[in-house]
């Protein structure tokens, strides 16, 4: 009973219980509980030792870091744009014949059916340009409707669209912030002159809107949007990450609808990203300020062969990067009827869309060059290292050879000096021996005495015989003394030579 009462009191005092597994602590306030949960989140969760005796090694090595990056998709996001563009360029080269066949089939169709040959694949930056053009327009959601077969005028252009276009193309002429409210009659021949500094954005947007045409005009095509909903979301997310400034004015629904239409059309026409159909300008949005972006009547199929003939001509001009204003300032002459004069500016607008495509294989080549650059740099670096090592070895070899030659010369001079020293030692020993033999010699003293005795002044009167005997004794004594002196001198010279040798040894 006491235990139950204490438990109830504890529950009343601390009503907040930790929900972590294996933890049943209680806390009086929610703040304490949040701090406790944060501690749980910060602790490492190792597996139980009973089930797994070996703890998993979670050391952050470079290999695991690269593996995690591959799992997340970091490297694929960096390289997907170049690979995708290069793949599209290859598909373009392999599907030229299919495009001509689809164009022939599209010539027999009228109305919304002609939009099925519109461009479906564009580079990532062009798609983002279209999103930037369409989003700031508050009327864009009301414009994407079924295209009627009559001509109509286009409304005023918002200032945010022109500012976005001006920011996107700074290298061209500046675009004013306000556009004319109404447009002239599209049936006039003078309206074929195209003066568009932002022709690339307009053409890309026209191709995208033409791509949306059949889905919007045909109610039966709307279920095709649902299977591509996830892909459209992915494309929308990628576009938002590249251009976060485009999220303005609350047009997320319009942009999502456009991306869904793009995703549905990409599966239907995957190989038509180079030859946009000339009739794609039927469903242009109202914020295009140029006179030829009107709706073309759907009951004129006779200009179709002419446009099919003009396709190779514009394809031949697709690589003219140095002349972007080839069809911008010069008016296109009227060909057969007023309708053909109205369609020809659309073909002129198609050319910048085509000029966007050729840099795709160059991007692939640039990537291959980037891939080859590290190997080339490493090869040159190794060559420089080898050359430097060779030069260093050569210098060291010359230095060692010079040292060896110098050592040989020094050894020869040392041997010569040693020979001279030994000769000088012998001479010194001989001279010392002579000095010792002749220093205080008794012979000289006896000779002096004998000479003194033999002289007539000092010699006695009668002593010849003892003198002779005395001379013999002196000679015998000198012989014995000389032998003894020579022995003494020899011993002394040997001792001196040994001492002198020890003195000369440090020099050697």
From Swiss-Prot:
Residues 265-391, 449-468 are annotated as: Disordered. Belongs to the bZIP family. There is a cross-link at residue 50 (Glycyl lysine isopeptide (Lys-Gly) (interchain with G-Cter in SUMO2)). Its main location: nucleus. Keywords: Activator, DNA-binding, Isopeptide bond, Metal-binding, Nucleus, Phosphoprotein, Transcription, Transcription regulation, Ubl conjugation, Zinc, Zinc-finger. The modification Phosphothreonine is found at residues 59, 61. GO terms for molecular function: cAMP response element binding; DNA-binding transcription factor activity; DNA-binding transcription factor activity, RNA polymerase II-specific; identical protein binding; sequence-specific double-stranded DNA binding; zinc ion binding. Residues 369-386 have a biased composition (Basic and acidic residues). This is Cyclic AMP-responsive element-binding protein 5. Residues 375-438 form the bZIP domain. Residues 337-346 have a biased composition (Polar residues). Residues 377-397 are annotated as: Basic motif. Binds to the cAMP response element and activates transcription. The modification Phosphoserine is found at residue 137. Binds DNA as a homodimer or as a heterodimer with JUN or ATF2/CREBP1. It comes from the Eukaryota. InterPro entries: bZIP, bZIP_sf, bZIP_transcription_factors, TF_CRE-BP1-typ, Znf_C2H2_sf, Znf_C2H2_type.
């Amino acid at each position: 009973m006491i235990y139950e009462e204490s438990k109830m009191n504890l529950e009343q005092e601390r009503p907040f219980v930790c929900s972590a597994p294996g933890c049943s602590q209680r806390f009086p306030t929610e703040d304490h509980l949040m701090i406790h949960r944060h501690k749980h989140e910060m602790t490492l969760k190792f597996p139980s030792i009973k089930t797994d005796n070996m703890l998993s090694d979670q050391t952050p090595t470079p290999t695991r870091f690269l593996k995690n990056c591959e799992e997340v998709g970091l490297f694929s996001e960096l390289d997907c744009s170049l690979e995708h563009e290069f793949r599209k360029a290859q598909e373009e080269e392999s599907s030229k014949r299919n495009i001509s066949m689809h164009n022939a089939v599209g010539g027999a169709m009228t109305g919304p059916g002609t939009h099925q040959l519109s461009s479906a694949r564009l580079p990532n930056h062009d798609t983002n340009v279209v999103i930037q053009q369409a989003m700031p327009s508050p009327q864009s959601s009301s414009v994407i409707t079924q295209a009627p077969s009559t001509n109509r005028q286009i409304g005023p252009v918002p200032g945010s669209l022109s500012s976005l276009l001006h920011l996107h193309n700074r290298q061209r002429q500046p675009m004013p912030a306000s556009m004319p409210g109404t447009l002239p009659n599209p049936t006039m021949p003078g309206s074929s002159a195209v003066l568009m500094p932002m022709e690339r954005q307009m053409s890309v947007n026209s191709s995208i809107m033409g791509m949306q045409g059949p889905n919007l005009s045909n109610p039966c095509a709307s279920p095709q949007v649902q299977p591509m909903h996830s892909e459209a979301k992915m494309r929308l997310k990628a576009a938002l990450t590249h251009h976060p400034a485009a999220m303005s004015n609350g047009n997320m629904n319009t942009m999502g609808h456009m991306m869904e239409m793009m995703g549905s059309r990409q599966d239907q026409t995957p190989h038509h990203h180079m030859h946009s159909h000339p009739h794609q300008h039927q469903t242009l949005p109202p914020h295009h300020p140029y006179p030829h972006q009107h709706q073309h009547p759907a009951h004129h199929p006779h200009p179709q062969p002419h446009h099919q003939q003009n396709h190779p001509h514009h394809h031949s001009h697709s690589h003219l990067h140095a002349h972007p204003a080839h069809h911008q300032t010069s008016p296109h002459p009227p060909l057969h009827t007023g309708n053909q004069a109205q369609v020809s500016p659309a073909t002129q607008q198609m050319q910048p869309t085509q000029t966007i495509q050729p840099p795709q294989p160059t991007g692939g080549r640039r990537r291959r060059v980037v891939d080859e650059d590290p190997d080339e740099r490493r090869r040159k670096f190794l060559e420089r290292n080898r050359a430097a090592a060779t030069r260093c070895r050569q210098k060291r070899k010359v230095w060692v050879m010079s040292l060896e030659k110098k050592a040989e010369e020094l050894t020869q001079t040392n041997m010569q000096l040693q020979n001279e020293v030994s000769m000088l030692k012998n001479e010194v020993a001989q001279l010392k021996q002579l000095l010792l033999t002749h220093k205080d010699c008794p012979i000289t003293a006896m000779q002096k005495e004998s000479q003194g005795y033999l002289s007539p002044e000092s010699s006695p009167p009668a002593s010849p015989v003892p003198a002779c005997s005395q001379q013999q004794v002196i000679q015998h004594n000198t012989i014995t003394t000389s032998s003894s002196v020579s022995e003494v001198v020899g011993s002394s010279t040997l001792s001196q030579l040994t001492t002198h040798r020890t003195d000369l040894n440090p020099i050697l």
